[in-house]
A protein has these predicted regions:
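A short, basic N-terminal segment
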Residues: 1-38, 61-62
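Walker A/P-loop nucleotide-binding motif
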Residues: 37-55
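Conserved small helical "lid"/interfacial subdomain of P-loop NTPases
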Residues: 127-167
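The conserved phosphate-sensing helix
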Residues: 165-166, 174-188
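Post-Walker A helix-loop "phosphate-sensing" segment adjacent to the P-loop in P-loop NTPases
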Residues: 60-70
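Structural recognition of the conserved hydrophobic beta-strand(s) that form the central parallel beta-sheet
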Residues: 84-86, 105-112
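Conserved P-loop NTPase "ATPase switch" module shared by AAA+ and STAND
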Residues: 68-95, 100
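Short regulatory helix/loop adjacent to the ATP-binding pocket of P-loop NTPases
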Residues: 113-126
Length: 201
């Protein structure tokens, strides 16, 4: 987990290993497939807060340089480094390809699919992260177990058998999935006094 201390779980406890992450079975399979095929150019697509950057970091074995497009000009990039570039949606084709040539592995993060904007000979494999996060019982069990671990880690007291607690976890999933950032934020908001405070459902 990250060493910085902001008081925000979503920042302070950002996973630094795959084992610490909330991955669906579909995400695990896709990650293994991408790693097995040793793909060097990947675009990860999805809405805000669902974990695109974390998935990209896992793909780069947490060794990638994470940059926003605005930081490119002032950041030296070693050719051997993996670069994870955020905010790529508005970049023109030529700029995307120029960026790709600056690193051994290039992972682009976008909110929309940009694969059709890149030259066929330099195409990026697109991964739609939301498609790997189905809203089903398996995904619910994954997020529930992840949140129980987060609560334990933060020494938050809760009664796992309490009906309201169970309903609150289900409600977080129903209303916010697949926005992992918001799920963790809302979990922290319900645990401010050191114990879980259920909101009647």
């Amino acid at each position: 987990m990250s060493a910085s201390k902001t008081g925000l779980w979503v920042v302070d406890q950002r996973p630094m290993r795959v084992e610490q992450m909330m991955f669906t079975d579909e995400m695990n399979r896709e990650l293994e497939n991408l790693q097995d095929n040793k793909l060097k150019r990947v675009t990860i697509v999805g809405s805000r807060g669902i974990g695109k950057t974390l998935f990209a970091q896992a793909l780069a074995d947490f060794q990638g340089l994470v940059l926003k497009v605005s930081e490119l000009e002032n950041t030296p990039i070693q050719h051997t480094e993996a670069i994870i570039l955020k905010g790529i949606d508005q970049q023109p084709n030529a700029e995307i390809l120029r960026i790709a040539e600056r690193a051994e592995k290039t992972i682009l993060i976008a909110q929309e699919d940009i694969s059709e904007r890149t030259d066929k000979s330099n195409s990026f494999h697109a991964v739609n992260l939301e498609e790997l996060m189905p809203k089903n019982q398996k995904s619910f069990e994954k997020i529930k177990n992840y949140l129980l671990g987060v609560l334990d880690q933060n020494q938050i007291q809760f009664q796992i058998g309490d009906l309201q607690f169970q309903l609150n976890i289900e409600e977080l999933f129903d209303k916010l999935w697949p926005n992992m950032r918001q799920i963790v934020r809302q979990t922290q908001m319900r645990a401010k006094p050191g114990e879980w405070v259920s909101i009647p459902v």
